[in-house]
Amino acid sequence: MARGYGATVSLVLLGLGLALAVIVLAVVLSRHQAPCGPQAFAHAAVAADSKVCSDIGRAILQQQGSPVDATIAALVCTSVVNPQSMGLGGGVIFTIYNVTTGKVEVINARETVPASHAPSLLDQCAQALPLGTGAQWIGVPGELRGYAEAHRRHGRLPWAQLFQPTIALLRGGHVVAPVLSRFLHNSILRPSLQASTLRQLFFNGTEPLRPQDPLPWPALATTLETVATEGVEVFYTGRLGQMLVEDIAKEGSQLTLQDLAKFQPEVVDALEVPLGDYTLYSPPPPAGGAILSFILNVLRGFNFSTESMARPEGRVNVYHHLVETLKFAKGQRWRLGDPRSHPKLQNASRDLLGETLAQLIRQQIDGRGDHQLSHYSLAEAWGHGTGTSHVSVLGEDGSAVAATSTINTPFGAMVYSPRTGIILNNELLDLCERCPRGSGTTPSPVSGDRVGGAPGRCWPPVPGERSPSSMVPSILINKAQGSKLVIGGAGGELIISAVAQAIMSKLWLGFDLRAAIAAPILHVNSKGCVEYEPNFSQEVQRGLQDRGQNQTQRPFFLNVVQAVSQEGACVYAVSDLRKSGEAAGY
């Protein structure tokens, strides 16, 4: 009897032990297979604006490349898949988080003003906008030296390996992507493209190329092969640069090989702004990080949450405060002048990062949206948008890169170097931003506390100067929770509005990353009028109109955001469907 009882107890204990082991095993497995959802990755991810380029970036990571390696490879690819947005003839900004050192640095390789330029260039803004075609708007390209500096500091794989996938793409029968074809057939762009040297590349007779049409580009393939094997100096001081300078001189360009040789990227610390549990790292002036930081810092103080969006009046209230904050931000863009070229601007953006100004702005935001432009320090300025490309990368070790690259407006200056296969930027067009409509050029570069003196005046370009930019490749880090958000966007002047709204929706309003990027945005122009992306909530639009917000129609919206987030063991990556993007990870 006792023996039978003992056997029963032993069996019960054995069963309990097995059950406990199963539970422990399940817990352990759940940690490795966390409930991340089917769209999550376990290790790393790349978000470029096309599937093929995201895939190339992922492959580089899987070959033990660093996040910088993957970013460069994805950008080189994008210059071929979406050449209307970026390329070797443009410029790039990297924001890089090194998990080993815990530091975030910025490499600014945006284009600069060449030594020879028209002193009265900015008097041509009214005639040039919105496209800015012509060789007079070309800045010194910085793209390749930006890649080289980033690779020198943070690369792991051999330099040439980063170019091989795109060279293979070009040599293997490259075809036109649907997004590129859409730009080629755009009714505004098409006449200028047809009249430019780009016609030889993108037209079949009188017709623009269509999706899946062959796009032979042997000159660019050869250029990439040369840069891969010989390094970037073959462009900046060697035969590639000489060929480019000679080609575009036929279009009226005054760019010289000396301009190329003098170009150097700038390496600086990222701006750092606390946003509750997160810290935002973004690029300093002349990039737009200070404006993005200002917007989010002001909005943080309103303590918006998921509950704020639960009822119609709450949603209207959130977007009213956003609109008013964007108006005040627009009035501060004068602070984005290049501090290297204009020393009095050295500390001009510092106030934008602090709580004192943020609190002052919050106190000036009330329930109405019909204040005079002077309330926000707004002056009617030139604006344009739709260009640029962004890549976000998160590596296995937690290091991250946000990189935004551009030739400025679609197809840049529409000037093509046939021997190198390079499309040139029109970056000097961004200098028009500092010249309010109706202003003339003034020889005085700095007057008092504000650049250019009173509103209505502007000052000529300075050789070596970088244009003010809306580019905001950014990284947000929550060290306590081990969370990150690597984010940036494209779309010219729409970039800051789009990125700010994606961050606001993700951090505070309860949106997941995909929904935060997909949500229709609003934008405030320099007249203080609200522009709504198609499908933006009509209910919110009516509510804002009731509060006195003026609205206007924007002829063309193309705001594009790419982001990667890390939440515990889960990695999420989203490329914006507005540009038919698709992220990749593993």
Swiss-Prot record:
It catalyses: glutathione + H2O = L-cysteinylglycine + L-glutamate; an S-substituted glutathione + H2O = an S-substituted L-cysteinylglycine + L-glutamate; leukotriene C4 + H2O = leukotriene D4 + L-glutamate; S-[(2E,6E,10E)-geranylgeranyl]-L-glutathione + H2O = S-[(2E,6E,10E)-geranylgeranyl]-L-cysteinylglycine + L-glutamate. Expressed in follicular dendritic cells in lymphoid follicles (at protein level). The keyword Nucleotide-binding does not apply. It holds the Pfam family G_glu_transpept. Residues 30-586 are extracellular. GO terms for molecular function: glutathione hydrolase activity; leukotriene C4 gamma-glutamyl transferase activity; leukotriene-C(4) hydrolase; peptidyltransferase activity. GO terms for cellular component: plasma membrane. Belongs to the gamma-glutamyltransferase family. A previous study reported that GSH and oxidized glutathione (GSSG) are not substrates for murine GGT5. However, this result contrasts with two studies reported that GSH is indeed a substrate for GGT5. This is Glutathione hydrolase 5 proenzyme.
